[in-house]
Design a protein with these regions (language model features):
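Asparagine-centered strand-capping/turn motif at beta-strand->loop junctions
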Residues: 8-14, 218-220
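Terminal connector regions
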Residues: 58-94, 314-328
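Residue-level detector of functionally pivotal "anchor" positions at catalytic/ligand-binding pockets or at interdomain
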Residues: 1, 88-102, 332-362
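Intrinsically disordered, low-complexity Pro/Gly/Ser/Thr-rich segments with frequent PxxP/GP/PP motifs
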Residues: 30-59
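C-terminal tail/sorting-segment detector
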Residues: 373-385
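Short acidic/proline- and small/hydrophobic-mixed sequence motifs that coincide with surface turns
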Residues: 14-19, 224-226, 363
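Short, conserved sequence motifs used for protein processing/export or organelle targeting and
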Residues: 34-43, 74, 132-338
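Local sequence-structure signature of Cys/Sec-based thiol-disulfide redox active-site neighborhoods
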Residues: 94-132
């Protein structure tokens, strides 16, 4: 199956790089040599993306790809201190994969003075991507919205604000959650098909837990599969809480945060209330899977007591690859308790329609793309104007 590999290369030399020769092995196959090209010459000190074509010998999951650079601009390259880079890949037949949804897990906190940058980035990319393929989760640490069940993120990424996309640290890595980086990472993640799909057939809420009926389906056969289902409860319109705001009084254009005080009273979205579990639930997916077969899982449940208002909640189900740690695919549905209020009109509830930003400030003239709270009488809803 003809395939392509994308690699990141940093130029530590004094001259530009146009091509690199890559010596690689896949699984137990013999070493092969390929030429990786850049879209434009890589200048000294810069890091760029190159890709090369290769043909795997077999279709299957979790194959080890090992490579090293052996040529630069057609000339032999030897670096005694360089170790081969490795990645675990899955090879599927062309056209046999599934549409890939993108999970962005952002590490944030009200104590973090730069985190307004992530708040703006997440809201803007949500305004761009409205087809359900984006699943944003804001994981708060050391503030009133934090949950110990999501402490795994502390070991996965450093500092705040920061984010990971499908937990893919090979082709994407840890990123800053500004809008431009989030959008690029989303586009990269969406390009490749997923090896599996996951569906939440139904959820049932009671006073302390939410129970799930979930199905999964794979595009490959695997006899020693190591996949697990993870469940997340997320809530919007949380707060207000005081958000530390470095941008207050600066000349940085950050969607109005530069005009807000420090700290700024803020309503938060996409707040992770609980996850079960960060590594995924054991025995939630069989160890032997067959392509095209649907597997049901009805034993999953999650603590929902952290949710303050179920009308603002939604639930996420993810397939975790236990070997690589990556999210192979995910899906999200609103809480059954949520009420669709997006089409509120004055006739439905007496009173004028008014708009507020996430800090609770009135917005007289909304502009296209803004995420706002819309009120009408006693009713309110979160909308993208």
């Amino acid at each position: 199956v003809p395939s392509r590999a994308v690699i990141a290369v940093t130029n530590d030399a004094a001259n530009a790089i146009e091509t690199v020769g890559v010596t690689y092995t896949l699984g137990e196959s013999e070493a092969q040599i390929a030429t990786a090209t850049f879209s434009k010459p890589l200048t000294p000190g810069a890091t760029g993306i190159a890709q090369f074509a290769f043909t795997p010998e077999a279709i299957g999951a979790n194959q080890l790809l090992s490579l090293k650079i052996s040529e630069v601009n057609g000339q032999p390259y030897v670096n005694e201190n360089a170790y081969p880079k490795t990645a675990t890949i899955t090879v599927i037949e062309e056209g046999s994969g599934f549409d890939r949804n993108v999970v962005i897990e952002e590490k944030t906190g009200t104590w973090c003075k730069f985190c307004p940058r992530g708040i703006v980035g997440m809201e803007k990319i949500k305004a761009d991507v409205t087809d359900g393929t984006l699943i944003p989760i804001a994981v708060h640490t050391s503030d009133p919205m934090s949950t110990t069940s999501y402490s795994g993120i502390e070991y996965a990424i450093d500092g705040a604000p920061s984010a990971m996309v499908n937990r893919n640290f090979v082709s994407i890595g840890q990123i800053d959650p500004n809008y431009n980086d989030l959008k690029l990472a989303y586009e990269i993640a969406r390009k490749d098909p997923a090896i599996a799909e996951i569906t939440i057939n139904s959820v049932e809420e009671d006073a302390s837990a939410t129970k799930f009926d979930i199905s999964t389906r794979f595009a490959i056969d695997e006899s020693s599969a190591r996949y697990r289902i993870a469940l997340v409860a997320v809530e919007d319109n949380v707060g207000p809480y005081p958000q530390t705001n470095y941008y207050s009084g600066t000349n940085v254009d950050l969607d109005g945060w530069e005009k807000l005080p420090n700290p700024a009273s803020t309503i938060f979205n996409d707040v992770a209330r609980a996850i079960k579990s960060y590594q995924g639930l054991s025995s939630s997916i069989p160890s032997t899977i067959e392509a095209g077969t649907t597997y049901s899982y009805t034993k999953g449940f999650i603590d929902n007591t952290g949710i303050k208002n179920r009308a603002n909640a939604r639930y996420v189900a993810m397939i975790i690859n236990s070997l690589t740690g990556r999210i192979e695919n995910a899906t999200s549905i609103p809480s059954p308790s949520s009420v669709a209020l997006d089409n509120i009109g004055a006739a439905e509830n007496e009173g004028p329609v008014r708009y507020f930003n996430l800090q609770g400030q009135p917005v007289e003239n909304p502009t296209r793309g803004q995420l706002l709270i819309r009120t009408c009488g006693s009713k309110s809803s979160k909308i993208v104007f």
